[in-house]
Amino acid sequence: MSREPEIMESQVMWEPDSKRNTHMDRFRAAVAGSCGLRLANYNDLYQWSVESFADFWAEFWKYSNIVCSRLYDEVVDTSKSIADVPEWFKGSRLNYAENLLKHKDNDKIALYAAKEGKEEILKVTFEELRQAVALYAAAMRKMGVKIGDRVVGYLPNSIHAVEAMLAAASIGAIWSSTSPDFGINGVLDRFSQIQPKLIFSVEAVVYNGKEHNHLEKLLSVVKGLPDLKKVVVIPYVSSRETIDISKIPNSVFLEDFLATGKGDQAPQLEFEQLPFSHPLFIMYSSGTTGAPKCMVHSAGGTLIQHLKEHILHGNMSSNDIIMYYTTTGWMMWNWLVTALATGASVVLYDGSPLVPSPNVLWDLIDRLGITILGTGAKWLAVLEEKNLKPCETHNLQTLHTILSTGSPLKSQSYEYVYKHIKSSVLLGSISGGTDIISCFMGQNVTIPVYKGEIQARNLGMAVEAWNDEGKPVWGESGELVCTKPIPCQPTHFWNDENGSKYRKAYFSKFPGVWAHGDYCKINPKTGGIVMLGRSDGTLNPNGVRFGSSEIYNIVEAFEEVSDSLCVPQYNKDGEERVILFLKMASNHAFSEDLVKRIRDAIRVALSARHVPSLILETKGIPYTINGKKVEVAVKQIIAGKEVEQRGAFSNPETLDLYQNIPELQNF
């Protein structure tokens, strides 16, 4: 079991305005009226939403005004469990992109794009976005992209990424993306499994004040993807005239690619009408036990779940301007872009959030009138360490919500936000995962914010904390489970014909119940949730989710190292860092030079954010009798717990090497 956190004092940090007529209030009243229920508060609404989950999703479909060409025949077969992966909204026909582009005010800004170190902010109206998507889609069709084909982006958080994704979705192609900070191995581990027909990328990116050439990496990636028919290169940092793409097979500049979609007149926007369960996105697991699993998310499930979170939980409307600091390799990018469906404006920022100054995001908030800011918990902690006080340097008048995810938000960060950023803001810690491309729990405009707690479990998400016996526990740590079907679970994994990988990933711990791989604790008094870190071998420092095997693949190339072990360590706030242990090969010594070379290799092949916090020497690495490296046991030991059952180990004495390591104290 995870270490118990201190008892929460349930200190209120923010309270909702009782006079405010929110979407959540209006939805609760609508449900009470149409279903003949008495729903006095959020808790009543939540309990109904999980007990009568089919009715809940039907009511929300109606409330959210989803655009469809055919209504559903059945919401879901309620006799099926979450492990059966039931089909949702059978018979309906819709298109995800159509729902994001439906906003009628043509001149309203849909996208703002800001880049590190650039004063200029690009703006795209909803009408311009529709025209661009039509052009991208026409060019895709011209080259033979059809329903079910994979279109991928190796792209920064930019307007081009949104346009290409929406065009792919409009056709019924499946979109997948990684960000330019991924190295060659990281990209090929993902994209090679899904055999894309078309890739979009850039020639260079700027991060942390430096320009990083991208073409060599792109060339290596393209060579590893034999099914590619076309490589579209977008001049992003330099002008086209200075870029040489002649070495990249089947490559074309964006301008020339789009020209193929132009006829005598501008192409019309066409939206393929597809089943609710039609694949929209392929997302990736961390790759803990080998190649990353490819999670297929449906168009309808992603849309309705994101709309629920944006409209009901976030009270979002067309008056909002949202910026989430993310890359295209994180699910928060997909989540952010769906906000267009509410008519809100989306701000895309590409670059470091600390360059040219740590105020860069606050400057954007004041300049654009941003109302919702999303970030990683780590960024808030960094600002606090730097003693930044945005409330003294910035207006922040428009800002009503700050969202945080990626890792647990420390209690002291709540204090920092309310004291030094804005006292009236809703600070929403949100938590879910790539596996559901959304949240199990998060912000809520109708209930208080308590220090150190995520506000509530989200509507329709039957979340509990279970002990090892499979019993719900309250006020103590347990495995985060979801007990009822949800439309946002993956429809399947790519290349998992019989579904065995899918079942193993979520349903091997508790039969018929989704086990998410997180430990959490639900406060029985407030209903708030405290996240306590991962319960499996996945590494997730600062929201960058990856597997130990991705690190091992790099370290194996060093002849000085005979073996390695990569594990997370958590502090009392649930913050995570990654520790890499090296077992040296005979006649080789552990050295700072080796540590530097390994760090550099990981940075180049994967990204700077994959580099372990500490690299230490060990004399032995534990294995099971059947030859599996045992990370979980070491993770427990460095957290101060005993490993009682040692019978499965071929070398149990090695476990003692991880007791009381000086470098791991006082984290």
Swiss-Prot record:
Asked whether the keyword Ribosomal protein is assigned, the reply is no
Q: Which reaction does it catalyse?
A: acetoacetate + ATP + CoA = acetoacetyl-CoA + AMP + diphosphate
**Keyword Ligase belongs to the record:** yes
Q: What Pfam families does the annotation carry?
A: ACAS_N, AMP-binding
Q: Sorted alphabetically, which PROSITE patterns does this protein's record hold?
A: AMP_BINDING (PS00455)
Q: Name one GO biological process term.
A: positive regulation of insulin secretion
Please name the InterPro entries in this protein's record: Acac_CoA_synth, ACAS_N, AMP-bd_C_sf, AMP-binding_CS, AMP-dep_synth/lig_dom, ANL_N_sf
Recite the UniProt keywords alphabetically: ATP-binding, Cytoplasm, Fatty acid metabolism, Ligase, Lipid metabolism, Nucleotide-binding
Q: What is its EC number?
A: 6.2.1.16
CDD domains attached to this UniProt entry: AACS (cd05943)
Where in the cell?
Answer: Cytoplasm, Cytosol
One Gene Ontology MF term: acetoacetate-CoA ligase activity
Q: Which GO terms describe its cellular component?
A: cytosol
Principal place of residence:
cytoplasm
Record's function text: Converts acetoacetate to acetoacetyl-CoA in the cytosol. Ketone body-utilizing enzyme, responsible for the synthesis of cholesterol and fatty acids.
**Protein family according to the UniProt entry:** Belongs to the ATP-dependent AMP-binding enzyme family.
> Could you tell me what this protein is called?
Acetoacetyl-CoA synthetase
Q: Which organism is it from?
A: Gallus gallus (Chicken)
Gene name, per UniProt, is AACS
